[in-house]
């Protein structure tokens, strides 16, 4: 037969468990952080534009125009709101293997349509000549990463009486 435990024994056991049990603690928050680093500001240009076009030589001269190829600026700097960049361009003279050159002052640049990704205001500046470093496309009011792509047209005013030949120039883009 079972003997019932006296109430005092049960109360003593419950008290002992209560005293020996770990006290409850308040929850403490943990702060976790992460860092997003900015990338680079880069420009990609065609390595070989090929021919801009052909034109018959005339006494009065004329213009030869053609596409240069796709130019792209990628801005992965995660820039703060309001910052921007400027893509610039410069050209050497168009020179033949022998004979007089066509000066860089006769070389113009038209950016054309700009394909945009990200938040910014893009402006095509279309410099009339490339004798010095000239802004081609600017981006202002940037927030975060962005990119712009365009396919510029190069316009060369060929003076009258130029010798029949193949003329070459180096067109250089940069971005800051």
Predicted regions and their residues:
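N-terminal small/polar-rich segments of proteins
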Residues: 25-117, 132-176
């Amino acid at each position: 037969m079972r003997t019932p435990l006296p109430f005092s024994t049960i109360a003593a056991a419950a008290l002992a468990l209560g005293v020996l049990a770990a006290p409850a603690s308040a929850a403490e928050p943990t702060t976790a952080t992460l860092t997003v680093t900015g990338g680079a500001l880069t420009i990609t240009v065609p390595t070989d534009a090929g021919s801009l076009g052909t034109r018959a030589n005339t006494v009065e001269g004329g213009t030869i125009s053609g596409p240069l190829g796709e130019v792209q600026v990628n801005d992965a700097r995660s820039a703060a709101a309001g910052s921007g960049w400027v893509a610039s361009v410069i050209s050497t003279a168009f020179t033949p293997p022998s004979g007089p050159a066509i000066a860089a002052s006769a070389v113009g640049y038209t950016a054309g349509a700009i394909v945009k990704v990200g938040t910014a205001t893009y402006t095509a500046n279309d410099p009339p000549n490339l004798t010095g470093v000239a802004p081609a496309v600017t981006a202002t009011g940037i927030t975060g990463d962005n990119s712009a792509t365009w396919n510029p047209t190069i316009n060369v005013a060929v003076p009258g009486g130029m010798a029949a030949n193949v003329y070459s120039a180096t067109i250089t883009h940069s971005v800051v």
